[in-house]
Amino acid sequence: MSTAGKVIKCKAAVLWEVKKPFSIEDVEVAPPKAYEVRIKMVAVGICRTDDHVVSGNLVSPLPAILGHEAAGIVESVGEGVTTVKPGDKVIPLFTPQCGKCRVCKSPEGNYCVKNDLSNPRGTLQDGTRRFTCRGKPIHHFVGTSTFSQYTVVDENAVAKIDAASPLEKVCLIGCGFSTGYGSAVNVAKVTPGSVCAVFGLGGVGLSAVMGCKAAGAARIIAVDINKDKFAKAKELGATECINPQDYKKPIQEVLKEMTDGGVDFSFEVIGRLDTMMASLLCCHEACGTSVIVGVPPDSQNLSINPMLLLTGRTWKGAVYGGFKSREGIPKLVADFMAKKFSLDALITHVLPFEKINEGFDLLRSGKSIRTVLTF
């Protein structure tokens, strides 16, 4: 029996308040409105950004259904939708590509004005919500809300992908892999023979290591306080791994000594102000580029000496690895299908969706790189 045009009742993980576990609830998911798509989720990755909301470091309206790194199958479409149809395999996009705004029309940048990242409303683009639980409307998260068996997204925030794609793997391209890999190849534009440093060896950081290797970096120095992640980093391309806790001097000084004055490219993939500064300071003062990849804590600021930039450093950042989402994500999936890279090393745990809290515990304890939840 077709569910198109009807309210769907299903299971979802609702975050009712910060610093509390997710609650598996029965929710109602309304049909898609015009230019919207309802998706049956198949697999979803657990990303540190979701945990930033749980901890309160990233403010987003609650109660909400979080989740943004996922893959699924189109269940139904709203009026006017032309780019996907029921049955298509898709990846929801936490940064849309409307194709009409100044950013989308420019060859540079990908931060479409339709995003719900800067000042999150917790709604779809028309300002309304599609989830109800216990008689209450539930907020969306960055326009995706993939911790649910069904979700509704705007058409400009969904990417159709190869019909043969293994969704339990390519879901990582929905955030972690694309963000890290793209930070190296698109944002920093790592050059052959260069020296790179990557701070943070979670799923995004390791993807940045993979991007540096793909771009031809000669040295890739991986930095983390969890030595258990070093073997995986070397497997994926790191040439050296260092633990800041092994040194008495600041890690940026260690890196400068190791690299004749500083690295060519550095990446902060943690989301801490102190490591953002260390990442900036470790790149060469005359020609280094430092990229902010990790999501910073809410309402916190960095203060720097402008001389650090006047000498020639470049300090930049980007979401989604600089990919224009609707164009870039399907191409990455195609590259994966062509075996240009593997995602297997990033997926350390696969759990049923109902064990979402266990998956977050693995993340917080440093025991996992990426946990994929299956529906």
UniProtKB/Swiss-Prot annotation:
It is an enzyme of class 1 (oxidoreductase). One of its GO terms (molecular function) is zinc ion binding. It is found in: Cytoplasm. Its EC number is 1.1.1.105. InterPro entries: ADH-like_C, ADH-like_N, ADH_Zn_CS, GroES-like_sf, NAD(P)-bd_dom_sf, PKS_ER. CDD domains: alcohol_DH_class_I_II_IV. GO terms for cellular component: cytosol. It catalyses: all-trans-retinol + NAD(+) = all-trans-retinal + NADH + H(+); all-trans-4-hydroxyretinol + NAD(+) = all-trans-4-hydroxyretinal + NADH + H(+); all-trans-4-oxoretinol + NAD(+) = all-trans-4-oxoretinal + NADH + H(+). NAD(+) binds at residues 200-205, 224, 229, 293-295, 370. It comes from the Eukaryota. Expressed in liver. Binds 2 Zn(2+) ions per subunit. The keyword NAD applies. The modification N-acetylserine is found at residue 2. The keyword Ubl conjugation does not apply. Zn(2+) 2 binds at residues 98, 101, 104, 112. Homodimer or heterodimer of closely related subunits. This is All-trans-retinol dehydrogenase [NAD(+)] ADH1B.
